[in-house]
């Protein structure tokens, strides 16, 4: 099959469909199998805690001649404890070392939130640990300071593109105005319960490619014990979604992915089982109708599952 690509504002191209590596079991083998299946985009992060394993799968595939490094698009993310300018490159180099790679194609600021620095030898990845039990400790690091340090990574050839994740439209606009290197990509929670139409439209108007995560809505957050997810009807059981799926002879999951992808948004679903790799990769081989889109639009509840306000009343989206 021929992969579809979106063009970033620096001329580089990102596949429209990739694999998300959050909570990916048997990561090395799954990544290797995904490359063999035809995947070229892998969405990763320091916070996922499996960059060594993902890197192992990537390097094994390269060594076996399945693919060349230049044909892959590897995304990683800067975690909250490493936002101070003196720590950004350290965090990047740690991730590159774990991957055994020389560069990332895209490096995202995971959240616009700055926690206290935690040395790698103390706890890595630190997650929500800030050096004092379960207590959140913050550093007064403005976003632009972190961004300037990320721009330097581009200058040094350590990353090809930089972007942001989990930000509001106002913060994105402010960053665009102040940035020397504009954000190339925006990654957001995106599903029919949280459509974020204005943010998506604004980013696309600015030439920023949007990637949507958690396209199945509450499903991704159930294993985290998310109370909102527990109380929400799974999208794959929603009558609107199941009706559209039956009409097209597809599964509800395929409809949910195609809805995102058909809006010009990249998707990065996790594949837990090898037999779902091909299904997800070929999700662009059918089209939803205008009527399908109109029905799905009615499902928007502005319902966010990944909300830092629930962590510690962090006002990322208030």
Curated annotation (Swiss-Prot):
Classification via InterPro entries: AKR (IPR020471), AKR2B1 (IPR044486), Aldo/ket_reductase_CS (IPR018170), NADP_OxRdtase_dom (IPR023210), NADP_OxRdtase_dom_sf (IPR036812)
Pathway: Carbohydrate metabolism; D-xylose degradation
GO biological process: D-xylose catabolic process
EC numbers, comma separated: 1.1.1.307
GO molecular function: D-xylose reductase (NADPH) activity
Reactions catalysed, as given in the entry: xylitol + NAD(+) = D-xylose + NADH + H(+); xylitol + NADP(+) = D-xylose + NADPH + H(+)
Active site: 48
Origin superkingdom: Eukaryota
Site, as annotated: Lowers pKa of active site Tyr: 77
Assigned keywords, A-Z: Carbohydrate metabolism, NAD, NADP, Oxidoreductase, Xylose metabolism
Binding site for NAD(+): 165-166, 214-223, 270-280
Sequence intervals crossing the membrane: none
Protein name as annotated: NAD(P)H-dependent D-xylose reductase
Organism placement in taxonomy: Eukaryota, Fungi, Dikarya, Ascomycota, Saccharomycotina
Name of the gene this protein is made from: XYL1
């Amino acid at each position: 099959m021929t992969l579809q690509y979106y063009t970033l504002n620096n001329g580089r191209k990102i596949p429209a469909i990739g694999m998300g590596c959050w909570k990916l079991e048997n990561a090395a083998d799954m990544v290797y199998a995904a490359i063999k299946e035809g995947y070229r985009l892998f969405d990763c992060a320091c916070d996922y805690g499996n960059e060594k394993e993902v890197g192992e799968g990537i390097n094994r595939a390269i060594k076996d001649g399945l693919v060349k490094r230049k044909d892959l698009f590897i995304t990683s993310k800067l975690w909250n404890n490493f936002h101070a300018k003196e720590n950004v490159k350290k965090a990047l180099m740690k991730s590159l070392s774990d991957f055994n790679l020389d560069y990332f194609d895209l490096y995202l600021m995971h959240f616009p939130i700055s926690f206290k620095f935690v040395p790698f030898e103390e706890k890595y990845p630190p997650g929500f640990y800030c050096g004092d039990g379960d207590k959140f400790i913050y550093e007064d690091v403005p976003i632009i300071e972190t961004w300037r340090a990320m721009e330097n990574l581009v200058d040094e050839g350590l990353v090809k593109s930089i972007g942001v994740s989990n930000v509001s439209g106002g913060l994105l606009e402010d960053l665009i105005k102040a940035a020397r290197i504009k954000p190339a990509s925006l990654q957001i929670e995106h599903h029919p319960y949280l459509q974020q139409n204005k943010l998506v439209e604004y980013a696309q108007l600015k030439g920023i490619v949007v990637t949507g995560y958690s396209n199945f809505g509450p499903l991704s957050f159930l294993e985290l014990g998310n109370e909102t997810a527990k109380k929400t009807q799974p999208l794959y059981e929603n009558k609107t979604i199941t009706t559209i799926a039956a009409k097209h002879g597809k599964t509800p999951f395929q409809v949910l992915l195609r809805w995102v992808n058909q809006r010009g948004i990249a998707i990065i679903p996790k594949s837990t089982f090898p037999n779902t790799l091909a299904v997800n990769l070929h999700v662009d081989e059918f089209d939803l109708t205008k009527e399908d889109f109109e029905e799905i639009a009615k499902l928007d509840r502005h319902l966010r599952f990944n909300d830092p306000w629930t962590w510690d009343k962090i006002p990322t989206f208030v």
